[in-house]
Amino acid sequence: MFTAFKRFCVFLLAAVVLFPVGSASADVSLPAPQRTGGSGVFDALGSRASAVGADFASMKDVSLENLSTVLWAATGLNRGEKGWTVPMAMGMEPYVKIYVARADGTFLYDWRAHALKEVSKEDVRGRVGKQDFVAKAPCTLIFVSDSAALSKKFKDDDGEEFAAVAAGAMTQNVYLASGALGIGTRYIRSARDDAIERILSLRDDDDVLCIMPMGVKPGA
């Protein structure tokens, strides 16, 4: 007959087996994005620029507060529960996903919850870009078409054009928000697509659209 102590030991062992330490996901709840203030839209357009590749090595990490604002600018809700910061065809929900590669892991931006959902604890920044400077950036955004969302309205590859157009609007918003926050970034179409597909375990019909390495400029 088990004593109370033996029962406790069995329970503890089962807990360790079923829920090992370190197995829990590390999702990140983002702070509220900045929606007011900053420079005017014409100032932001006037200063929009791509960061020089060599500068990424000296950039600092992007805070969660600033990352929150950049991601919201890219594809966040701005008018209650139905309305985004970028146009989507036929009133659809966003059909381009944004993954965030950081030193502490890789995450998927959840626009509904305005949160980062952990995909991997691995630092993959050095494996997503073809240029050496991408690996030195504190953070990289990865834009991927969402084939599951696109299939609700489009057949075959028709939706890919819409995904590319949406990614264009999203990346421009990233540029403008980043510029207002003192963040340097760069749009890059040429990425290690095959490696990214494996790292993120993408669906067969999901396509890597572009990447944007980023970091806080020195002195910002």
Regions found by a protein language model. Give the residues of each.
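Generic beta-structure capping elements
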Residues: P33, V144-D146, K217
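Bacterial N-terminal signal peptides
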Residues: V10-P20
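Bacterial N-terminal signal peptides that target proteins for export
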Residues: M1-L12
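N-terminal amphipathic, basic helical "cap/leader" segment at the start of enzyme domains
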Residues: A24-A137
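Solvent-exposed loop/turn segments at secondary-structure junctions
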Residues: G76-N78, G105, S147-L150, P218
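Small-aliphatic-rich amphipathic alpha-helix that forms the alpha element of a beta-alpha
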Residues: R48, V70, I98, C139-L150, ...
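Short coil/turn connectors at secondary-structure junctions
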Residues: K136-P138, D206-D207
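A glycine-rich helix N-cap at a beta->alpha junction
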Residues: L202-A220
